[in-house]
Swiss-Prot record:
Needed co-factor(s): Zn(2+)
Protein name: Cysteine--tRNA ligase
Taxonomic placement: Bacteria, Pseudomonadati, Spirochaetota, Spirochaetia, Spirochaetales
UniProt source species: Treponema pallidum (strain Nichols)
PANTHER family hit by this protein: CYSTEINE--TRNA LIGASE, CYTOPLASMIC, CYSTEINYL-TRNA SYNTHETASE
Binding site for Zn(2+): C29, C227, H252, E256
Length: 520
């Protein structure tokens, strides 16, 4: 069986075949760094990481590009609302680039804790402004863009297949798109309400924090042009896989595709993969006619703008490990909405600990028969398999591989490993070799944790991964941000910062001379 993926473009599962044999060009939508990543955001990056790891496992060479949006992302995908970075900078009393750098670092701290490997190339939008300007100039030259009211717009009518992408892919977001279109319909400079801005001049925001010189006046890029320009800069005119959330299909990704294919005149992305939302359990008290009341639970998409979200530090404060959350995510199919609750996470933690305990027993048995269990990195795992019965190990992973080749079915892949660990007919050393290879895909550190639990004589599943201590500069930035939040009476934000620092082992004490901190 070869890899099959569900392609949003065709709305069906297809055999995967990259443009270039053996080499996959992968682009993943990265974060807009105006706040801490919430758990729903992190689901996206665990999935991107899983796709990349799976492709490596299947023998592909992967060039993985991820953007960092630090300019031009408005509150609505359809050119309306405030700039998210500017609003965050104003709230914190810092420059846009300072805020972006802070939250960029926070993003990569969280992804590292989750075992997410860094992309081959990480590109900041603010570093690629000239590439965006050159891209817009090409669109204008080809008749796909026009200048009006000081801005440059993409002319949707010039690209006949614009509506064909995502037209029936996600009906649930239709209402949101229609609302966004309605908000910008009054823009009299647009020839069509669907047209979108490629370059804003000061006609949009008179005192925008970040502006650059351009042929159309000093201004800044729209959000959609950034991803197109960065993808084509680092991956070339063709991309094999583009990954993003279902909420971006109908506007952002549709616009990206239109921009790129208007330039090249040829298909741009071969396979579009879209992951579903992580839902958050909300509870509220309902008052009944008889004056009684009850607690009503519901699930809703995590949203920073609505204040409905949890961060990774929120989980750590409750005693969960990042690996518990990664295991929870891998237990769900990426194209299915996943409901997060504390009970669900407890169940995932129990399942992961049980699995690690079983693996620890297998590792112990392998030690007894071979004397040691060798390296645990992807390279050592591959070396070990090559040295000892590689074909047998590959055979043990037949079901695991088949699950991943079926549109990255991680729930089935986990089930296959559970079955392997319980199979007493498999020699322990061979089982460990197979598990080492499998974990280069799952990224759970199962063998490392099982081995550490045996060495440290602590319960398997309870060992914590090593992580670097936070720098004094980073701590100082957060302490100052918390002080500003308290001054502006943004107490929820101040509490969030305290919790984040506590999760990193930093204790705060507020005194009449200011806030002091110490490591605990």
């Amino acid at each position: 069986m070869a890899l099959r993926v569900y392609n949003t473009l065709t709305r069906q599962q297809e055999h995967f075949q990259p443009w270039e044999h053996g080499h996959v060009r992968l682009y993943g939508c990265g974060p807009t760094v105006y706040n801490y990543p919430h758990l729903g955001n992190l689901r996206a990056y665990v999935f991107q990481d899983t796709v990349r790891r799976t492709l490596h496992f299947l023998g592909y060479r992967v060039t993985y590009v991820m953007n960092i949006t630090d300019v031009g992302h408005l509150e609505s995908d359809a050119d309306s609302g405030e700039d998210k970075l500017v609003r965050s900078a104003q709230a914190h009393g810092h420059s846009v680039l300072q805020v972006a750098a802070h939250y960029r670092a926070a993003f990569f701290r969280d992804t590292a804790l989750l075992g997410i490997e860094e992309p081959s190339i990480v590109c900041n939008a603010s570093d690629c402004i000239q590439d965006m300007i050159a891209f817009i100039e090409q669109l204008l030259a080809r008749g796909h863009a026009y200048c009006a009211g000081g801005n440059v717009y993409f002319d949707v009518r010039s690209f006949p297949s614009y509506e064909s992408f995502g037209s029936a892919a996600v009906e649930d977001v239709q209402e949101g798109e229609d609302a966004a279109r309605a908000r910008v319909a009054h823009d009299t400079h647009k020839r069509d309400a669907r047209d979108f801005v490629l370059w804003f001049t000061r006609s949009k925001f008179v005192r925008h924090a970040l502006t650059w010189d351009s042929p159309w006046g000093r201004g800044y890029p729209g959000w959609h042009i950034g991803c197109s320009a960065m993808s084509m800069k680092f991956l070339g005119p063709r991309c094999d896989i583009h990954i993003g959330g279902v909420d971006h299909i109908r506007v952002h990704h549709r616009n990206e595709r239109a921009q790129c294919e208007a330039i090249t005149g040829a298909p741009w992305v071969r396979y579009w993969l879209h992951h579903e939302f992580l839902l958050m359990q909300l509870q509220k008290r309902a008052v009944h006619a008889d004056m009684g009341s009850s607690v009503v639970s519901s699930f809703s998409k995590m949203s920073k703008s609505c204040g409905q979200f949890l961060t990774l530090s929120s989980l750590q404060e409750r005693g969960f490990q990042p690996a518990d959350f990664r295991f929870f995510l891998l237990s769900g199919q990426y194209r299915t909405q996943l409901a997060f609750s504390w009970d669900a996470l407890k169940t995932a933690r129990a399942a992961r600990r049980s699995f690690v305990r079983r693996v620890a027993r297998v590792v112990d048995a392998a030690r007894a028969t071979t004397g040691s269990v060798r390296g645990t990195s992807a390279e050592c795992a591959a070396e070990r398999v090559c040295e000892s019965r590689a074909s047998e190990s590959e055979l043990l992973l037949t079901d695991f591989r088949a699950a991943l080749e079926d549109d990255f079915s991680t729930p089935r892949a986990l089930s296959a490993l559970q079955k392997l660990v319980r199979d007493t007919s498999v020699p322990p050393s061979l089982c460990v070799s197979a598990l080492q290879v499998a974990d280069t895909v799952l990224g759970l550190g199962i063998i490392q944790e099982a081995t550490a639990s045996l060495s440290a004589q602590v319960p398997a599943g309870d060992t914590l991964p090593q992580r670097p201590l936070p720098s004094e500069e980073w701590i100082g930035q957060l302490v100052r941000a918390r002080a500003h939040a308290r001054q502006t009476r943004d107490f929820p934000r101040a509490d969030e910062i305290r919790r984040q620092l506590k999760a990193e082992g930093i204790e705060l004490e507020d005194t009449h001379l200011g806030t002091i901190w110490k490591r605990v």
